[in-house]
Amino acid sequence: MNTVRRTLCLMVPLLLAGACASAPRAHPWVLLGQRVVDFHVDHDIIEVGRAEGRFRELRLVAHQGVVEMYDVRITLGDGDLFRPEGKLVLDRGEGRTINLPGDHRSVRNVNFVYRSLRGAGQRATISLYGR
C-alpha cells in the first residue's frame, strides 16, 4: 500500500506539470515581399532566396483592393517549379495559404500574373508571407 501511495505521490506532480505545459506555438508568418498591383494584367516576381529560410507554407494577402491572380509559379530552392492550381480572387484583407510540396523547402522566387479589379476603387497591394 505504501508503494502505491508513494508512486501516486510522485506521478501526480509529473502529470500536472505535463498538463500545465503550454502547447507549442505555431511559427509566425515572415513577410517575404510586397507588390502594388495595377489595373491591367501585370507580371511581377518576388525574389526570396535561401537567406530567408525554409518554408512549409506561403500565404498571399491582398490589401487596399481586390486582386485577381491568373497564375502563380513558385520556383523552389532545387529549381523545381510548383504551380498551385486555379485562378485566385482575393478580396481586400483576404489571404490564401499555399502548402508547399515536401517538408521544409527553400524558395528562390514567386512569379505572379495578376491585376487589380476596378470595382474595388483603388490598386491593391499583394503581400507574400512564409512560415
Task: Name each region found by the language model.
Residues 44-49, 95-102:
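Exposed aromatic-hydrophobic patches
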Residues 38-69:
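Short, surface-exposed binding/anchoring microloops in extracellular/periplasmic proteins
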